[in-house]
Amino acid sequence: MTGARGATMTGARGATMTGALVARVLTDVSGIDKEFDYTVPAHLADEAQVGCKVRVDLAGRRVGGWIVALGELSRDPDLAISPEGSRPALKAVAALRGWGPTADLVDLAAWAAWRWAANRALFLGTASSRNTVRHLPAPRLAPPAPPPALRLPTGPGAHVVAIGPAEDPTVIVAQAAQLGPLLVIVPTASRAAVLARRLRRAGGDVALLPEEWAQARAGAAVIVGSRGAAWAPCPGVAAVVVIDAHDELHTSERAPTWNSVGVAVERAERAGVPCYLITSCPGPELVALGPTTTFEAAKQKAGWASMQLVDQRSEDPRLGLYSSRLVDLLRSTEKVACVLNTTGRVRLLACGACGTVARCDVCHAAVSSPEPGVLSCQGCGAMRPYVCASCTSIRLSWLRVGTSRAREDLERLGGRDVGEVTAATKDFPSSSVLVGTEALLRRLDPSSGFATIVFLDFDRELLAARFGAAEHSLALLSTASRLVRGAAGLVVVQTRMPDHPVLQAATVGDPAVALSEEDSARRALRLPPYGALALISGAGGEAWIASLRERHDGTVEVMGPNDGKWLVKAPDHRRLCDLLRSVGPPGGNVRVAVDPQRL
């Protein structure tokens, strides 16, 4: 391994001999976000550089880590003299383990640790190859052929690019690649592989992550991968693209809840290059990041599938989720995919008299009944009497059914074999009728021939206990439109709220119909992007929150506990993240979720 030395180290511990090369190392030991200084043996000095992976001795055992800074003692004789005035003897780096993240990613990891209340090692691990890389191939920098007559804004920072759900983003990627080395982030690994094949057919040199990390580190015209690709090395990066920037798969559900959109935008701003956020659902948080560009508005609307809304309030109550329209589809010869989200995100109460779903008067989320005579919001906690807001009936009942039960019912109603798909499904069924959770939408391919997608109970999404429920619901309809190839396909939505702005927006193919109302609601409730949130939970949450309360300046609101969770709301991310950092890194018994997807 060879390479130039990285950044100059300042404020580091000293070494025992003048002129010695000292490496500041961040270890990969879980729970330790502290740097340690080591001398670099002479035979390794020419190869050591910021970002490279090393092995060092720490507390009696050998551990891995990364060099985060390098310096020569002779250039700063005051390096880390101990409080007693002596220079402690430093251990030597035991071994270099190969190429690691570039120096800019080492700096970016420090920012991400502040932004999402985490340790830097987690991000440096994501930025590193899964395998040891000791030798790099030659750079491959031939871009794909440019598309005809497509111009993109080239200013630095975020640019929101609005397209239709069924539009192919490959042409935008190919155009962006003309600027120079390009980093592309896609929601799923399977879609990243498809995009890589298309770009290669267009003559582009592509590194597909994670398998081709070494080529990315050496240099490639286009580097493509899923969420972790936001941390991929991209020497000389000239632009960044995030495809389906609205997709929640860009956000980690596990703490730290970092998202590739935020990392991509920050990375582009630091490099002074454009970051194109391609989306069919430009929600409030995306729009707040930068100006929006729309290509061919008519084509964008045509990318939405034909939407057919089935008002379940007018259906025979005995049919439950199985409307007469659904039964007709099942008894036809069409290939039908049915989506029923049973991940436990929300349980719905509906009026037995008029069929209206009970929801919060304040934030419109679903409500529950924690005690007799009371309805409580699962989102904001607001309470109201146990009556239907539409007809004042007190005959409310739970709506529940799972995918396994639904599969049996669909087989009986349609007389066809029905395949079930969940996140745990390994072998994808070959049935012409499928039922599953959102995992079905993730694994279905536009070439599979399913021209009809049915959402059996879409109200679960519209009323989910999350501040982005409307945006996420619209994103699901966008995904369905892409899978059925836009206007050529059909999306059937069973609902008790056919007038909901999300459904009206999808019907007319104009996301602004729903997202403008969503923006107004967020502004009124001081939700992102007009505020910043963190959700604290875990056995040690109470003590951690007590420490936080002692430090905040009154501009931060702490709500809870509610079911063992605390919600911290701040005017902006700077004040929120500074406060979280002042408390210190959360231990193993505390979970801190910044920008939580679900409350």
Spans of model-derived segments:
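Accessory, non-ATPase domains that flank or precede helicase/AAA+ motor cores in DNA-metabolism machines
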Residues: M1-V310, P317, R331-S332, C354, ...
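Amphipathic alpha-helical transducer elements in NTP-driven molecular machines
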Residues: A45-A48, G64, T102-V106, R217, ...
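C-terminal helicase module of SF1/SF2 nucleic-acid helicases/translocases
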Residues: V50-L58, P282, S324-E334, D409, ...
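Conserved phosphate/pyrophosphate-binding and hydrolysis machinery centered on Walker-type P-loop NTPases
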Residues: G98-T102, A166, I185, A189, ...
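Conserved RecA-like helicase motor-core motifs
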Residues: A202-E212, D361-V362, P370, G414-A423, ...
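Conserved helicase motor core of P-loop NTPases
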Residues: T293-V362, T507-D510, E518
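Cys/His-rich short segments
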Residues: L326-R412
